[in-house]
């Protein structure tokens, strides 16, 4: 869409709001998500008038925050705009999730004018006590940098917050009073400066020496996780894997970080819930490199990992360790490059990875056979093609797909640490806006979708054509598996899912209800052929059936 200059922005004066937008554009932001409110309306005029940034409105602030998160995971930076008080508190859950999962999101809050705040009167959207920094203080717990912009220092403060967001890969908060947004200023004089390299030559040298001694002539095994992606060290990791025959795996959090079609890819490591071949290879490795790994309860089989520190090289954001000896400051990319150099320089080749025993292909289900979890995820996975962006909500969708190998070039997004159900539907909007050339595939349960379903209309308005699989298992199946199998609090109202897109303003779509394998197969075949429109497939599953991996996790679960 081509931005149209608004009447409110016909004044040629360059403002603080323009400065903020130009810095965001410099960092790769071409869309901003949010919800209008009277304290941010004039700033929104500047967004609409900006030559390279486009406004994408959401149905509510929570969904806008989720959309910004999905966008930020693919673009490396994103922004969401809300109004003071009521708007910013509504997006807090999404911002906290971005903080937990290392997603760079800039939260811009339109606030009352400085003069109005100075009166300490009971303004709308405030708590009525004359204190207008309550919510700024709340934001300090879930953002890496905050600023309450003042005219004289606005540019410097914007640069500080954006630099921290870029460096730490976590959200930042900017309180932009409506009069400060309009205040005249000068455009940026130079690109946003980058922090100097954070690697000490001495730390790198000592790390390399210790790694050489530990590795010796052993074959290296690698376990990688999402921080490699967030810290933009994927190329360095791939170079390490190409330096020798290196068996490797990821956690569920880092699924699709590496090419899962590679013969050296072992699978997903989840502690005691892992497939035995994967568990044995990771836990029995002579030397294991853990790159960007964060063990959380839901991706480690409730902390059942058995990793021997004496045989482990751990690569973190700013420090690394060899057999528990810490070396810092040492950036992840530098440590990975050092390991690749060690492997290429030692002049030996490790043996090939032994492939798993060949298993006969599963029998094709009969077309009239009722759907099961295994059938659904097998068929969904077979429908994926390179370039797809797959978002799986935290439930049977996430754990059903975690067990399946993805085609090369597929990006997988979940939220296993924060685990806010409903997240993926608006996040899919953000992902699709970030890369409209890549088809988005959304996998979500009925209970989760009921929380954020309004954004179906946003897909349509933005001209996006996702494939949406809604798992209708009649309520909160994961919760039923954990506790309260027949409890009324795990029940939800049954919706007519195939009629919902029309009710929410979707004008170009197809909708199917699949109860049998044949119906699912037909629906996904049509979805693959019709890339010009949204395709929603409701799949009906038994209310108590869960995927294998989720069953193992639930079985090992203790009260947390």
From Swiss-Prot:
Pfam families in the record: TPP_enzyme_C, TPP_enzyme_M, TPP_enzyme_N
Cofactors needed by this protein, per the record, are: a metal cation; thiamine diphosphate
* A molecular function GO annotation: thiamine pyrophosphate binding
Tell me, which GO biological process terms does this entry list? aromatic amino acid family catabolic process to alcohol via Ehrlich pathway
Q: Which residues bind Mg(2+)?
A: 446, 473, 475
Please list the residues that bind thiamine diphosphate.
Answer: 61
| Textual note on the cofactor | Binds 1 metal ion per subunit. Binds 1 thiamine pyrophosphate per subunit.
GO cellular component terms, semicolon-separated? cytosol
* EC primary class: lyase
EC number of this enzyme: 4.1.1.-
Q: What does this protein do?
A: Decarboxylates branched-chain and aromatic alpha-keto acids to aldehydes.
Similarity comment: Belongs to the TPP enzyme family.
Task: Report the protein name in the record.
Answer: Alpha-keto-acid decarboxylase
Q: From what organism does this protein derive?
A: Mycobacterium tuberculosis (strain CDC 1551 / Oshkosh)
Name the gene that codes for it: kdc
């Amino acid at each position: 869409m081509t931005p149209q200059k608004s009447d409110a922005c016909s004044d040629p004066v360059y403002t603080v709001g323009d400065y903020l937008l130009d810095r965001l554009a410099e960092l790769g932001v071409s869309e901003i998500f949010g919800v209008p409110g009277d304290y941010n309306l004039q700033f929104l005029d500047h967004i609409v008038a900006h030559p390279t940034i486009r406004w994408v409105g959401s149905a509510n602030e929570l969904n806008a925050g989720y959309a910004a998160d999905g966008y930020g995971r693919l673009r490396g930076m994103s922004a969401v705009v809300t109004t003071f008080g009521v708007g910013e508190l509504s997006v807090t859950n999404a911002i906290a999730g971005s903080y937990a999962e290392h997603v760079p999101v800039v939260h811009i809050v339109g606030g009352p004018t400085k003069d109005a705040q100075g009166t300490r009167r009971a303004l709308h959207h405030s708590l009525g006590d004359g204190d207008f920094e309550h919510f700024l203080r709340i934001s300090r717990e879930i953002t890496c940098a905050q600023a309450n912009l003042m005219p004289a220092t606005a540019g410097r403060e914007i640069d500080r917050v954006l630099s921290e967001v870029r460096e730490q890969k976590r959200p930042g908060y900017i309180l932009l009073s409506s009069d400060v947004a309009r205040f005249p200023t000068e455009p940026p004089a130079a690109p946003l400066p980058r922090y100097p390299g954070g690697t000490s030559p001495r730390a790198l040298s000592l790390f390399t020496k210790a790694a050489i001694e530990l590795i010796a002539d052993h074959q290296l095994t690698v376990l990688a996780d999402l921080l490699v992606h967030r810290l933009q060290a994927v190329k360095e990791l791939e170079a390490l894997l190409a330096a020798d025959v290196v068996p490797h795996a990821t956690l569920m959090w880092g699924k699709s970080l590496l090419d899962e079609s590679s013969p050296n890819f072992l699978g997903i490591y989840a502690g005691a819930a892992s497939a035995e071949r994967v568990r044995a290879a990771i836990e029995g490795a002579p030397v294991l490199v853990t790159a960007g790994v964060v063990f959380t309860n839901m991706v480690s089989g409730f902390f059942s990992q058995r990793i021997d520190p004496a045989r482990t090289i751990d690569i973190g954001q700013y420090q690394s360790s060899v057999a528990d000896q810490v070396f810092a400051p040492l950036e992840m990319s530098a440590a990975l490059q050092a390991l690749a150099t060690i492997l290429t320089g030692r002049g030996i080749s490790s043996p090939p990875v032994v492939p798993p025993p060949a298993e006969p292909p599963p029998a094709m289900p009969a077309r009239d056979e009722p759907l099961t979890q295994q059938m659904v995820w097998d068929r969904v996975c077979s429908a994926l093609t390179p370039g797809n962006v797959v978002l799986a909500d935290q439930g049977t969708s996430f754990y059903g797909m975690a067990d399946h190998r993805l085609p090369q070039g597929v990006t997988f997004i979940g939220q296993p640490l924060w685990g806010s159900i409903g997240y993926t539907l608006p996040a899919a909007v953000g992902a699709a806006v970030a890369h409209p050339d890549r088809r988005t595939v959304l996998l979500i349960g009925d209970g989760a979708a009921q929380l954020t379903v309004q954004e179906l209309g946003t897909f349509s308005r933005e001209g996006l054509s996702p494939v949406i699989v809604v798992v209708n298992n009649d309520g909160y199946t994961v919760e039923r598996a954990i506790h309260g199998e027949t409890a009324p609090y795990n029940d939800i109202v049954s919706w007519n899912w195939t009629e919902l897109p029309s009710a929410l303003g979707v004008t170009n779509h197809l909708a199917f209800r699949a109860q049998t394998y044949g119906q699912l197969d037909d629906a996904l075949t049509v979805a693959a052929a019709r890339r010009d429109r949204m395709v929603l497939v409701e799949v009906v599953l038994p209310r108590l059936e869960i995927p294998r991996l989720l069953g193992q996790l639930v079985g090992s679960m203790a009260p947390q």
